[in-house]
């Protein structure tokens, strides 16, 4: 995965409130997405911006801000966003979605974590295992 740093930024009339100053010595995050039209969106740092028609690139100071913006982009039916970490040395690391599929979607190679092989209606009655020494989540 490569990050095109020449991608235009959304039109934003404000500032990030100093969020990106620390990124010069630590790391910053970039989110890219493609929009079918120009539309206004809310910045995670406050204020509003206008996303460009086509590809967009936005630098933010925290990964959580990128994830919040990604959640908002999904309300605009934009599902192709990608999040990168950029180190001060210029090294770029691809972060999200890690294997190309969003975490809540099913992926054939993905193993399920903390899942039960039956529906919630088949759970045992907690009263029947109360003093048996077995916890409810293990039964």
Swiss-Prot record:
Matches recorded under InterPro entries: PsaD (IPR003685), PsaD_sf (IPR036579)
**Keyword terms of this UniProt record:** Chloroplast, Membrane, Photosynthesis, Photosystem I, Plastid, Thylakoid
Q: Which SUPFAM superfamilies does the entry link to?
A: Photosystem I subunit PsaD (SSF64234)
Where in or outside the cell? Plastid, Chloroplast thylakoid membrane
Recorded hits in Gene3D superfamilies, A to Z, give: Photosystem I PsaD, reaction center subunit II
Q: How does it sit in the membrane?
A: Peripheral membrane protein
Q: Name one GO biological process term.
A: photosynthesis
* GO cellular component terms, semicolon-separated: chloroplast thylakoid membrane; photosystem I reaction center
Short name of any one Pfam family annotated for the protein: PsaD
Q: What is its main location?
A: plastid
Briefly state the protein's biological role: PsaD can form complexes with ferredoxin and ferredoxin-oxidoreductase in photosystem I (PS I) reaction center.
The UniProt family comment states:
Belongs to the PsaD family.
Name the UniProt record assigns to this protein: Photosystem I reaction center subunit II
The species this protein was found in: Trieres chinensis (Marine centric diatom)
